Amino acid sequence: SKSVMAVECDHALTQAESDKLCWLFGEATPESEENLKGHFVGPRREMITPWSTNAVEITQNMGLDGIIRIEEYFPVKDENADHDPMLQRMYKGLDQNVFTTNRQPEPIVHIEDLEAYNEKEGLALSKEEMDYLKKVEKDLGRPLTDSEVFGFAQINSEHCRHKIFGGTFIIDGVEQESSLFQMIKKTTQENPNKIISAYKDNVAFAEGPVIEQFAPADHSKPDYFQVKDIKSVISLKAETHNFPTTVEPFNGASTGTGGEIRDRMGGGKGSWPIAGTAVYMTSYPRTEEGRPWEEILPVRKWLYKTPEQILIKASNGASDFGNKFGQPLICGSVLTFEHKEKDEVYGYDKVIMLAGGVGYGTQRDCLKGTPEASNKVVVIGGDNYRIGLGGGSVSSVDTGRYSSGIELNAVQRANAEMQKRAYNVVRALCEEDNNPVVSIHD
């Protein structure tokens, strides 16, 4: 068979319920055996997939009650078949325990050797940062826990803090009066034109026209649509996702697009994405013969994927997320380059993947408010797993420094369906006459 569907329910299915499921699965045949032999690739027991969430919701809309989880498993030739170990696992046979998990939470670990833990987990902490953590340990009178050190590494990484761009530069012994970030911001400060917000939020906003908003009168219930004029702002956003796309092109580019869309959702007190773009830069892909300019350098042994594989898979990943989310990828560009100048060799061996896009919001919601002690903090989205953690710190060092396991784990995995659900909430709040959001962030 092409695939096997496993259904978890809280009661024995009636014949009518079983018939409905078979119809839903494309006239599938019920399996009479409780145990299936062979090798199968499917989702990890511990992780309910976005596909399952959607499938269960469809069964609820069909009037099928009591279905908890539905997952799909694919027969493979042997245990060496290719799969993503972060999201999938190899099953040697399928049985009634396919959804059973016996894992217990790992105990809190106190870190006795910060230097060793820093290298082991790929946290990219500098000597100064570790000296600071040791001072914190001394003040607390105890070693820091693994969660505390890991959390510090993420929020204090170069990816998040922009320590280089925001730092003080001393050139030839002379301290420079401006940081790189201050120099970048100077253009907008001296010539703001119609810029409303830049370099201080998830996205930049420029003044837009008065437009018609076509939206339900009340999002909390089924209601009639209405038209009203709103003063708009135009959002612009671009960011690179180089390290993840180098390591795992499909998910790297997919989550680059997804993260950039979230940034346009998280501007001010909420805003709307419209369309996206993508840029790819790699070394020569060597897809065809007869291109003498591509022979300027010998073919290297690539650490992860070849430039050809990266261009194909990254393009597929970026488009895949946009398609599933509902945002078209309308333009982009590709640059491939290698060069040798005397003994110097140049090339985009570490890939550039830039995701960008435009959107819009309301002038009412384009600036964040100041949170107060009495405000509520609300988190929406999917289940949390240890996926993509470490990306901010691992991407701050040279690709290939850490083990492939650490680097592959640091790449996020896309969940466009869940992101669209979160976006529906953000959009509903922004389209209401009174938006309760004070500040929003992804």
Can you describe what each PLM-predicted range is?
Residues 1-399, 404-437:
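Core nucleic-acid recognition elements
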